[in-house]
Structures are given as C-alpha cells and as structure tokens.
C-alpha cells in the first residue's frame, strides 16, 4: 500500500463537523462521541451527540478512525472534558489533540499502516466474540425458559 502522510492539520477543521440530526453522508465517514466520559470515542454507526469525520476515501477514514480509537483508549481527551453534570469535549479540543498526535506520529519513522491491519483483525475478532457472547446469553435464556415453563 502506498505510504501517505496525513499531516495536513489545517484540513482537519474542514473534515470534522458537528453532526446535524437526520443528515446523511455519501462519502466515507465515522462519528465521534462528544458527550459523557466516553467523549472522543469513534463509532462507525450514528450516535447521538457526536461530531462527524468526513473523509475523502476509505483509507483516510480508516486511518483517522484508528487514530481516534487510540486517543480514546489512552484517554488523551480526558483533561479537555468540560462541564459538571454532563461532561463534553469541544470540537476544537478534539482537533488540537488529533493534530498533536499526528505531529508526533509523523515525526518518527513509525508507519501506521504496519499496525493498521493488526488493529483491524483485533476489531474483527472482538466483534466475533461479542456475537458469540450474545448467542450464549440467548441460549442461557432459552434453557431457563424451557426449564421454568415446563409442566
């Protein structure tokens, strides 16, 4: 795969927007939760109270999705949470943290594409395990139902 540097930080401001309810997107995109303790967590599906990242292609979408997944898992946005009852993160803070991480990644010889496939495989396995767990819970309920409803 051709190596690209996604360092154009000024372009991030035009790619991350506040999602408006009911709006549909034709280009590759993902959502970033902006309220609660999970602020900054990326989602491939729509979530309420979110920003949307509008990518030019799937490679760019996947790159930024996994970058934000790493930022969320390392809790790099926690110091930027505002609010007392319901905490939230501002769009500008998300962009600033993402720019800082991109500058640090792009300054070294590390290639994100080296780990992107492994991260995608881990996500696939995690989804598979969640489905297996859901099936086991349904089986458990069915067994209880069969046992308790038997006359």
Locations of regions flagged by a protein language model:
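Hydrophobic/aromatic-lined pockets within catalytic cores
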Residues: 148
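Amphipathic alpha-helical segments
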Residues: 64, 95-145
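DNA target-recognition domains and sequence-specific DNA-contacting regions of bacterial/archaeal
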Residues: 1-102
């Amino acid at each position: 795969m051709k190596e690209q540097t996604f360092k154009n930080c000024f372009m991030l401001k035009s790619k991350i927007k506040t999602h408006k309810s009911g709006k549909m997107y034709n280009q590759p995109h993902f959502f970033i939760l902006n309220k609660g303790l999970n602020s900054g967590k990326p989602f491939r599906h729509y979530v309420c109270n979110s920003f949307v990242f509008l990518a030019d292609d799937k490679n760019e979408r996947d790159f930024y999705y996994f970058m934000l997944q790493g930022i969320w898992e390392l809790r790099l946005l926690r110091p930027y949470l505002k609010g007392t009852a319901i905490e939230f993160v501002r769009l500008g803070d998300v962009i600033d943290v993402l720019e800082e991480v991109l500058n640090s990644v792009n300054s070294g010889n590390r290639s994100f594409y080296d780990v992107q496939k492994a991260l995608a495989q881990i996500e696939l396995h995690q989804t598979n395990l969640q489905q297996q767990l859901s099936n086991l819970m349904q089986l458990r309920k069915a067994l209880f139902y069969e046992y308790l409803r038997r006359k």
